[in-house]
């Protein structure tokens, strides 16, 4: 599970759905929730969490994309398996991991130290209270 510390900057709720904007090192990230956690208040620090299997990977220019959460990084580790592969990168001193198909690794011709973008849909982000 990926966990990044961020601060809630804005909460918008309509018809039971909440859009939570978060400041992560000056970058705005978004989480969409069906139930607003009781600890979620504007100005509070939280962990944003998302599974490695929910992290998409792109190489090259990705200006027109619907994903709300984009992390520009360089691949640090790449472990190719027969069907699935894992890769990780550091973004603002936080390790982010991704699990994608080995076919995708080969199609994108990914290698360690390559610049990439990690993508996470806002609906795949959960919040965790910092205690």
Language-model features: where?
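Internal alpha/beta loop-helix hairpins
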Residues: 1-17, 21-28, 56-58, 131
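Glycine/charge-rich catalytic "coupling/switch" loops of P-loop NTPases
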Residues: 2-5, 35-74, 103-131
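Short, conserved beta-turn/loop elements at beta-strand boundaries and strand-helix junctions
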Residues: 11-16, 78-84
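A generic beta-sheet turn/junction motif
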Residues: 15, 24-26, 50, 82, ...
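Short, acidic/hydrophobic/Gly-rich beta-strand patch recurrent on exposed beta strands
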Residues: 19-25, 30-32, 86-92, 99
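Acidic- and glycine-rich mobile interface elements
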Residues: 90-110
């Amino acid at each position: 599970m990926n966990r990044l510390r961020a601060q809630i900057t804005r909460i918008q709720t309509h018809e039971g759905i909440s859009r939570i904007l978060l400041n992560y090192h000056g970058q705005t990230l978004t989480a969409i929730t069906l139930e607003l956690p009781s600890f979620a208040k504007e100005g509070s620090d939280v962990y944003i969490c998302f599974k490695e299997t929910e992290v998409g990977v792109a190489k090259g220019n990705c200006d027109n994309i619907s994903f709300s959460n984009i992390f520009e990084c360089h691949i640090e580790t790449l472990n190719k398996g027969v069907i699935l592969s894992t890769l990780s990168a550091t973004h603002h001193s936080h390790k982010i991991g991704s699990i994608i198909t080995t076919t995708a690794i080969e199609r994108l011709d990914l290698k360690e130290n390559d610049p990439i973008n990690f993508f996470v849909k806002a609906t795949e982000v959960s919040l965790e209270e910092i205690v």
